[in-house]
Amino acid sequence: MTATGRRLRADAERSVQAILEAAERVLKEDPAATLEQIAEAAGVARTTVHRRFANRDALLAALAESAWRQIAGAVEGARPATAPPLVALHQATANILAIKSGWTFALGQPATNEEIGRLQQAVYAACDEVFRRAQQAGDIRAGVDLAWARQVYLALINETAHGPTGGGEPDAAAARILDVLFHGIG
């Protein structure tokens, strides 16, 4: 989509996706990289980058928005409102870990526009819903502060994705996260 909401042609969408993927790779290595360096890594002309993104800030916002769209889609794909709560939580966790490993720079950017904030809130709301359903099913003790549980859960995901050992295979890492979350370390 363009800034005006018009749908891009398929080749233009491919160019934008190539630019975003190259931006993630290049900026992860050198956060001060120029748009020209990103264009070179994407295999497109510098003018193509400038035509799609007015400036560096616009590119960074689009990069973060794209990554958060993927996260939101991954969470929704886990069927948080209909799947059994622990199944939804495991699938969402594995999906998120798979995305986080490829979009570390983008997901580390601050929410710079309303759409990113909306996507983040949708992800957090889905997480809260799964936690409520898990508590109702008896998987989480009554009386547990679900807001605190979500913070711990998200911290476990972030540490798994960005910690010194790396995340590993997403499904196995999700199982480890949920084991620690639901059974502790003792």
Positions of PLM-derived features:
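All-alpha amphipathic helical-bundle segments outside canonical DNA-binding/catalytic cores
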Residues: 87, 115-119, 136-152, 168-173
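Basic, helix-initiating cap at the start of DNA-binding domains
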Residues: 1-29, 33-41, 58
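C-terminal peripheral helix-coil segments that are non-catalytic and often amphipathic
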Residues: 1-3, 91, 121, 125, ...
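Alpha-helical DNA-contacting segments of helix-turn-helix folds
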Residues: 53, 60-67
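Amphipathic alpha-helical interaction segments
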Residues: 18, 37, 58, 87-91, ...
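Hydrophobic alpha-helical connector segments
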Residues: 62, 73-101, 112-115
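Amphipathic, non-transmembrane alpha-helical scaffold segments
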Residues: 12, 64, 68, 116-124
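Short hydrophobic/aromatic patch on the recognition helix
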Residues: 43-53
